[in-house]
Amino acid sequence: MASNLDAVQRLVFAVIHHDDADTAGQALVEAGHRATRIDAQGGFLRRGNAVFMGGVGIEQVDDVIATLRSVSTHAFGQSGTGSAYGIVFVVPVDAFDRL
């Protein structure tokens, strides 16, 4: 989700429905964001899902979320909890480097 090491100020974790993962990955690339995808099951959404994570600048967070929201079409629903298309966590980054 970032190409400039100095610009990485936030780490974005996005958990989305597995059926939206390929489209989401492509949309992130087309929007100029780099991300790592991890396929997972269980956890917050209780079904097959994908976790995208990547470092971004503060000014890119809203664009990443909007990009993911625009391609998320499969809702997760649980009895009594309503439904959601995904969950996004944004965490401050103190340091970032590539090995």
Positions of PLM-derived features:
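Positively charged, small/polar-rich N-terminal and surface patches that mediate targeting and assembly
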Residues: M1-L99
